[in-house]
């Protein structure tokens, strides 16, 4: 384990204090899990404290942990994962926060802290339905405005709910319920005795 990573973890614990749920060092990376109610405050501290100085947000995404590892996950269903970069200290950090309510996933927007979070948060809202409180323009970014549901959720039907097609009589695009029939695919088992033997 690198001394730099241990030093970063110690700085995080010192600066964030009780805002931290856990800090883990694994596979050459530091991951910190922060409380949802102090997420925005923690982000401000990680950016502004000189011992951390995470000036840049590289990535932010939503995660649905509903079927994570076949029931081995006992935590909240929805999480937000961010990756930060400190140019001053040459550190990278993964930050996780979990939405406290699975039926209405809500976390604070960190767009005022790092403006690069803007479209990332819109994407997480569009695909997972995670609400970012305080985001000034939280609307769909990848799916159509009339789209029903959030397609990256584990409980979203694989075939979708509606399909879009061009209607030549109306001369426009129309939406209709999905016409795909569910079918079960059973693998074919080869029962020949000499199958695969060289001739």
From Swiss-Prot:
Catalyzed reactions: a quinone + NADH + 5 H(+)(in) = a quinol + NAD(+) + 4 H(+)(out)
Top-rank lineage group of the source organism: Bacteria
Alphabetized UniProt keyword annotations: Cell membrane, Membrane, NAD, Quinone, Translocase, Transport, Ubiquinone
Membrane topology: Peripheral membrane protein
Annotated localization: Cell membrane
Family, per entry: Belongs to the complex I 30 kDa subunit family.
Oligomer status and interactors: NDH-1 is composed of 14 different subunits. Subunits NuoB, C, D, E, F, and G constitute the peripheral sector of the complex.
NCBIfam families: NuoC_fam, PRK06074.1-1
Function statement: NDH-1 shuttles electrons from NADH, via FMN and iron-sulfur (Fe-S) centers, to quinones in the respiratory chain. The immediate electron acceptor for the enzyme in this species is believed to be ubiquinone. Couples the redox reaction to proton translocation (for every two electrons transferred, four hydrogen ions are translocated across the cytoplasmic membrane), and thus conserves the redox energy in a proton gradient.
PANTHER family referenced in this protein's UniProt entry, alphabetically: NADH DEHYDROGENASE [UBIQUINONE] IRON-SULFUR PROTEIN 3, MITOCHONDRIAL, NADH DEHYDROGENASE UBIQUINONE IRON-SULFUR PROTEIN 3
Protein name: NADH-quinone oxidoreductase subunit C
Provenance organism: Polynucleobacter asymbioticus (strain DSM 18221 / CIP 109841 / QLW-P1DMWA-1)
The encoding gene: nuoC
């Amino acid at each position: 384990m690198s001394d730099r990573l241990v030093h970063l973890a110690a700085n995080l614990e010192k600066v964030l204090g009780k805002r931290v749920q856990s800090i883990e060092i694994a596979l050459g990376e530091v991951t910190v899990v922060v409380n949802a109610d102090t997420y925005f405050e923690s982000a401000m501290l990680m950016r502004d404290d000189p011992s951390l100085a995470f000036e840049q947000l590289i990535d932010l995404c939503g995660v649905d942990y509903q079927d994570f590892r076949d029931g081995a996950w006992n935590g909240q269903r929805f999480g937000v994962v961010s990756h930060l970069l400190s140019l001053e200290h040459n550190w990278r950090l993964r930050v996780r926060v979990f939405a406290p309510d699975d039926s209405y996933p809500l976390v604070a927007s960190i767009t005022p802290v790092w403006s690069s979070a803007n479209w990332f948060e819109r994407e997480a809202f569009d695909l997972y339905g995670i609400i970012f409180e305080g985001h000034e323009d939280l609307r769909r970014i990848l799916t159509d405005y009339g789209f029903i549901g959030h397609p990256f959720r584990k409980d979203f039907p694989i075939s979708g709910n509606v399909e879009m097609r061009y209607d030549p009589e109306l001369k426009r695009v129309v939406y209709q319920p999905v016409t795909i029939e569910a079918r079960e695919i059973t693998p074919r088992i080869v029962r020949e005795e000499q199958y695969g033997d060289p001739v």
